[in-house]
């Protein structure tokens, strides 16, 4: 066996690829990780601007209730105490997210769980009555579904505009199943996640990726598809984390995605919005949210030690060739198309498909690591 032969060629250095390489390397396997971008880390890559780790491909917050996963990532890099507590801005008024007693006080002035529940029940009943008046018993679209779950006020101010910007379609044109449930908390708790553990790697996500890939051979600026037969010939098995339809030369057609555009700017003040995440929930503001990156890793007085800050405005758009694919569009048509590719993938003996693009599935970070751990 020559020196240039590998047990695994791993296409893509995002969380799936990097975790796979780490665990395979620990078992003594010889791995090569290639990535078409100029950097490692996939979409969790951070760019350092003005001493601030900027989440180049959108905000990533690690959260899990799986102790095994939490212990694993903390064995690579220590995680900080960041807690995701977004704020919604609707026409200049601020509301806490997720929907909790703070939100209901801000919306209606109610101060007890009973008052809040009564107000929600009253608004839900009104929504059901409106549907009945139209001769409808089941919600026909997202708008009706959201209103029977949470009522008109919260829907109009905090859900409608944001959702329409995210999907590029009116809520009356979106299917009801997109919102299966809307968690309502009758407690004063702004922690977005219910998980036991959450945080951001101390020093940023690049520290996690570099730690996972320590001792593993990597090559950047390498496109697997430009020299496919060569890459396929240098390893016993391939771990593929790119787009599954591209792997099969789009033979059944192209899968659809939503993408996100980021306008990132340096601001000459230490604190722009006082929070990492502020959602803009009215339709008239073109962006969906503003991320202020320093709040992921700097707390209290630390915020003021750096006189500058970096913000990213997020714009959600329809994906076109050449754009970064972010979110799969799991409608009927795309799901059926993916099923055809999945059928081919299942027959592969020497290719492992994993991650958001290869499985055409939205993933949080922790489940990706969990999935790779199950393989080993």
Can you describe what each PLM-predicted range is?
Residues 88-93, 101-235, 248:
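Active-site/ligand-binding neighborhood in enzyme catalytic cores
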Residues 50-125:
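Dinucleotide-binding Rossmann-like beta1-alpha1 core, especially the glycine-rich loop
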Residues 41-43, 88-90, 96-97, 155, ...:
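Short catalytic/ligand-binding loop motif for oxyanion handling, primarily in non-cytosolic enzymes
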Residues 25-50:
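Glycine-rich FAD pyrophosphate-binding loop
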Residues 6-33, 376:
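N-terminal Rossmann-like FAD-binding beta1-loop-alpha1 element of flavoenzymes
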Residues 9-11, 34, 233-245:
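Short hydrophobic core segments
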């Amino acid at each position: 066996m020559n020196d240039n032969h590998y047990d695994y060629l791993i296409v893509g250095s995002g969380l799936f690829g990097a975790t796979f390489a780490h665990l395979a390397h620990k078992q003594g396997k010889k791995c090569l990780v290639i990535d078409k971008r100029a950097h490692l880390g996939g979409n969790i890559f951070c760019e350092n601007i003005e001493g601030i780790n900027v989440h180049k491909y959108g905000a990533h917050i690690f959260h899990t209730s799986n102790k095994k996963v939490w212990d694993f990532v903390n064995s690579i890099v220590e995680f900080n105490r960041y807690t995701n507590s977004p704020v919604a801005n609707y026409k200049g008024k601020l509301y806490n997210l997720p929907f909790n007693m703070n939100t209901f006080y801000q919306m209606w002035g109610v101060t007890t769980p009973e008052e809040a529940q009564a107000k929600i029940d009253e608004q839900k009943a009104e929504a059901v009555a409106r549907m009945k008046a139209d001769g409808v018993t089941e919600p026909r679209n997202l708008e009706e579904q959201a209103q029977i779950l949470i009522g008109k006020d919260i829907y109009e101010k905090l859900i409608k505009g944001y959702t329409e910007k995210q999907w590029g379609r009116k809520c009356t044109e979106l299917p009801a199943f997109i919102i299966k449930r809307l968690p309502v908390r009758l407690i004063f708790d702004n922690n977005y996640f219910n998980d036991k553990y959450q945080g951001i790697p101390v020093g940023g996500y690049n520290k996690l990726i570099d730690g996972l890939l320590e001792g593993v051979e990597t090559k950047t600026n390498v496109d697997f598809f430009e020299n496919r037969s060569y890459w396929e010939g240098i390893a016993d098995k391939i771990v593929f984390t790119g787009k599954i339809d591209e792997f099969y030369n789009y033979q059944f057609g192209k899968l659809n995605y939503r993408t996100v555009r980021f306008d990132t700017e340096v601001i000459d003040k230490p604190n722009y919005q006082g929070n990492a995440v502020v959602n803009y929930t009215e339709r008239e503001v073109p962006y969906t949210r503003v991320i202020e990156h320093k709040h992921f890793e700097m707390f209290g007085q630390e915020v003021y030690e750096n006189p500058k800050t970096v913000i990213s405005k997020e714009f959600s758009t329809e994906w076109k060739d050449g754009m970064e694919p972010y979110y799969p569009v799991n409608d009927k048509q795309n799901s059926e198309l993916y099923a055809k590719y999945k059928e081919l993938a299942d027959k592969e003996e020497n290719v492992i498909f994993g991650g958001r693009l290869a499985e055409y599935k939205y993933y949080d970070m922790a489940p990706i690591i969990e999935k790779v751990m199950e393989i080993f």
